[in-house]
Amino acid sequence: MKAEQTPLSWDTPGLLAGVDEAGRGPLMGPVVAAAVILDELNPIKGLADSKKLTPQRREALYDEIRAKALCCSIALATAEEIDRLNILQATMLAMRRAVESLRLKPNKVLVDGNRLPTLAIVSEAVIGGDAIVPAISAASILAKVYRDRWCAEFHLEYPQYGFASHKGYSTAEHLAALREHGACPQHRRSFAPVAEVLR
């Protein structure tokens, strides 16, 4: 039996929003959060944890989610906010912004992981939620695609770092570029590999 057909402890009447983030680990750029309220009468096939989908499939689902969801919202916390608050608090901030920007107010919010942002709505953390709750899967896809597009756009301004390919993660290519060129305005100064270059 598929997980979504099993009665779940978080089944609640009314609108349900799924929330997830992308970009906690990279050395640069914002952390992006998305909140999605799906339309049960307009289902989307193939929703899954964004990390398990090909980039092409994520792109296709991104457009389908934007077209079919009752409402969705994407928000971010900047690299500057990450450095000021720390990555966990900045992630919670981005998630709260995403939920508060929804056009419709959900009855309950399900958040991927084991931490919850401070919300004025009933909420629950669901470990592995991006694989078992369709609304969280949809949110993970929106956040991931939005951030990947952001990196591709920023790459045009700073092509020497290779952001379009590694998306800001701590790859050998990125670390070599960081050592050669120093940090750009979007690098997270509080992250160790960036801080080392700035010493």
Swiss-Prot record:
It is an enzyme of class 3 (hydrolase). The keyword Cytoplasm applies. Gene3D superfamilies: Ribonuclease H-like superfamily/Ribonuclease H. It is found in: Cytoplasm. It catalyses: Endonucleolytic cleavage to 5'-phosphomonoester. Its EC number is 3.1.26.4. Its cofactor is Mn(2+); Mg(2+). One of its GO terms (biological process) is mismatch repair. Keywords: Cytoplasm, Endonuclease, Hydrolase, Manganese, Metal-binding, Nuclease. Residues 14-199 form the RNase H type-2 domain. One of its GO terms (molecular function) is RNA-DNA hybrid ribonuclease activity. InterPro entries: RNase_HII, RNase_HII/HIII, RNase_HII/HIII_dom, RNaseH-like_sf, RNaseH_sf. A divalent metal cation binds at D20, E21, D112. Manganese or magnesium. Binds 1 divalent metal ion per monomer in the absence of substrate. May bind a second metal ion after substrate binding. GO terms for cellular component: cytoplasm; ribonuclease H2 complex. Signal peptide: none annotated. Endonuclease that specifically degrades the RNA of RNA-DNA hybrids. Belongs to the RNase HII family. HAMAP family: RNase_HII_B. This is Ribonuclease HII. It comes from Polaromonas sp. (strain JS666 / ATCC BAA-500). The gene is rnhB.
